[in-house]
Structure formats: C-alpha cells, structure tokens
Amino acid sequence: MKESQVYLERARSRQQHFLYSLIFREYIYGLAYSHNLNRSLFVENVGYDNKYSLLIVKRLITRMYQQNHLIISANDSNKNSFWGYNNNYYSQIISEGFSIVVEIPFFLQLSSSLEEAEIIKYYKNFRSIHSIFPFLEDKFTYLNYVSDIRIPYPIHLEILVQILRYWVKDAPFFHLLRLFLCNWNSFITTKKKKSISTFSKINPRFFLFLYNFYVCEYESIFVFLRNQSSHLPLKSFRVFFERIFFYAKREHLVKLFAKDFLYTLTLTFFKDPNIHYVRYQGKCILASKNAPFLMDKWKHYFIHLWQCFFDVWSQPRTININPLSEHSFKLLGYFSNVRLNRSVVRSQMLQNTFLIEIVIKKIDIIVPILPLIRSLAKAKFCNVLGQPISKPVWADSSDFDIIDRFLRISRNLSHYYKGSSKKKSLYRIKYILRLSCIKTLACKHKSTVRAFLKRSGSEEFLQEFFTEEEEILSLIFPRDSSTLERLSRNRIWYLDILFSNDLVHDE
C-alpha cells in the first residue's frame, strides 16, 4: 500500500506553478475571445465598441472575495446579490479564463513527455479516430470475452478540484477556483443532475477539461493497477488526440504561448497478451482471451475505483461480461461483433481421407440503420419509419444550394461509413437523402415529384448521390471497372476522419 501511494505521489509531483497571476492577464481573455466559442462573452454592454474588457473580470473576482455568504436562494437563478445581472454571462467569462489557464501546465508537460517518448514520429499513422478499427480487426478476432463499459459521470466538482491540486501546486488559484464553483453551483444544488448538465451547457470548454482530466486520472490509476497485478510488462500504452487541434498546438503553443488550448484527449488504448482496452470519450471496451473470472476481477477493480476514489456510485450489474461471438458493441457509430465462418476442408493422408471443419473468426462492422434513421427523422429528412419527406426550411434557397447541402450530407455519411462490411444499409440512407432532396425541390416549385422530374430533367445530376464515391476512388486507384467494383464492396477505412459525424450518436 505504501509503495502504491509513493508511486501516485511521484507521478503527480510537479513543480510549483504560478497560475493565479495569469487570471489577471488580459491576453488570457484575448485568447478566449479569439477562440470564437462565444463572441459576445467579453463584450461590454455599452461604451466599449464591442471590445472585451479585463475590468469586468477584476470586478467579478473582487466581488467574489467580498461575498460574505455563499448560499444563494434557489428561486433567484437569473438575478441575485452575488452576480448582480446575468448568471450565465458572468459564469462564462470567468470559466473561460480558468479553462485556458489550467490547461497551460498540462499541455507543456504533455509536449515534453511526447518529445521524450518520441511519439510524434509515428503519431501520423494514428491521427484519425477510425484508426481504432484496424486495431479491432487485427486483435479482437483472437479474443473470447468482451465487456462494454460506460464510464460513470457526473463526479462532484469538489473532488475534481482536490485531484487537480495533486498535479498543480498553486493554492491561491485553487482557492479562487473553489470559490467560483461554490458560488456558481449554490443556486442549483437542489437538483444535482441538472446542475452538471447546466454547467456543461453554459461552460462547455471548462466542463470538457474537467471531464477529460477525470478520465485521464482514472486511466492512470487503472494502468498502475494493471502493472501491479501482472508480471508481464505493458506492451504499449499510447494517448492519441483528435488531429483537428493537435498540430495547431504543436506548432504554435510552445512558440506563442498558445493560440489554441482545446483539450481533445479522447482516444486511448493499450494492449498486452492478456487484456485489451479501448476507449473513445466516455465509453470503453475491455476484451480478453482468458477465462471470464479474470474479466470479473477487472470489473470489481473499476467499481471500487469509482466508488472509493472518485465517490461515483456504480453497481456491478451495470458492467456485463459477454462472449465476444455472442455480443455486439457500439463504437463510433458502428455496430461490431465477431462472426464465425465455418468451412470444411478435405485432407488426405496416404489411403485415408479426412474431413476437417475449420472455424475462422472475422470481425463484422456494420452500419446501425435504425439509429441513423432516428437521427435523420430528428433532422426532418424522413419520418420515424424511414420514409423520405421534404425539408421546407431549405425551400428559400436556390436549387443549387439545396442540392449541394444534400450532397454534402450524403458524401460525409458515405465517407464515414465506408468501412462497413455491409453496404445495403448505407445505400438505404443515401436513397432517403436523395428522395428528400427531390421532394424539397418539388415543394419549392409547388409541384409533384413526378412532374418536377419530368419538367426539369433532374435525374442526371441527382445521380451524383450514388456516383461520388466511385469518382473519389477513381482518383486514387486505376480506372479499372473490376478494381472499382471490388473496392466498393470491400471495407475502406479513411484515415482523414477527424471527428464523429453529426448524425452519429453513441448511446
């Protein structure tokens, strides 16, 4: 136990940081303003010609320190004695400053650790979020058991502050942070779930940092437990970042003290001969080739870790251990399972002939048609049964703009789901978008679909819904009909996918 505590303390030991003074630096809020999360955050209401003002921040911090009582009435959420005018407006101002300042030491530490480990050299091969699927295809076919885990949340904000104090040594800064969270949260503590959800909407940047930090802390302890429980060395442990912001950080942060501080720590996995761990955002998958009782041991590790260290309630029945051949899991908008392909091989030895049955495991990654139809129905492209409908909101646009919008959505979905082993569901989605586009154009011209197509001859350019993928492939591969036909049937993982599609929702 003493060795474990020494390990964690050594891992968290960092030099003294002086972050408190940065809260009062004007360029910190200039960075937040230029980040364009919300252009109206740091705007004076009158007299400053739409320029952000450091005077607002200093005035609010002074009022926070002068506040005598921190408990504010729950019935006074829009206007109270502490904030004075608008809670959301002032909360966003200070939380943006906190989020930018607190990211600085973590990213500088990350930059040095990546350079020491020389991870940057081979990072380019793993910069897409879809790079996880070749890993699944390569490794999961040899495994037997899988556990689909949702990382429990929310966690109390005070616990996050206490954990942050282990990593960053700056007492005045965390005193101010605790004071801010206590004052902000005091008028909605009667409904805890509403408190966290409201905080995440009003302060998305700061909330994402706290959430990602919580997940990183949990995974660092998880890796430590794995090392203590196994005599085998950890074969690999890598942390990947969504490419959309990574290179901007590498090129500008160290030189310019940061142009962009987004903390998109989202994709991690580690593997060893016994256990495989994959995580994207708040969902992780644990798979193993060994007996299920070893998986059960890890399940109880997780439960006790969340309950005892983070005070997040989680029950064992929420984590199920299933045979991989009988269970499908959802990740990044795909349904994945292991399919058993059985074949009979005739073997002849001298005068004897034997029939040998061979079972080959193959991972099956398909498009989840029902969730996609629900997403399209929510976006008003079809009804809940998948029947295409018109989009009258776009009827004021020109014909070219309407067609271009539908084509972009169709191309993005086709690009995202090109790795599916079954294309029938994808063709149905493209058909829904194609017919919805035609109905929208017919609605704009106050005509029926049949009359509109007959009058305008729109069949030709609407065929792009089914031909744009072949045109892209023809630019990459030789213009051989058999080659393109084979590629259109096979799985293709495009490693330029930076983030999940807007119509993709992981449940």
UniProtKB/Swiss-Prot annotation:
Gene Ontology biological process: mRNA processing; RNA splicing; tRNA processing
Annotated compartments: Plastid, Chloroplast
Signal sequence, renumbered to the chain: none
A GO cellular component annotation in the UniProt record: chloroplast
Main location: plastid
Keywords: Chloroplast, mRNA processing, Plastid, RNA-binding, tRNA processing
Pfam families referenced in this protein's UniProt entry, alphabetically: Intron_maturas2 (PF01348), MatK_N (PF01824)
Xref: InterPro entries: Domain_X, Maturase_MatK, Maturase_MatK_N
HAMAP family: MatK
PANTHER family: MATURASE K
Function: Usually encoded in the trnK tRNA gene intron. Probably assists in splicing its own and other chloroplast group II introns.
Family: Belongs to the intron maturase 2 family. MatK subfamily.
Name the UniProt record assigns to this protein: Maturase K
Native species: Lens culinaris (Lentil)
Lineage summary: Eukaryota, Viridiplantae, Streptophyta, Embryophyta, Tracheophyta
Annotated gene: matK
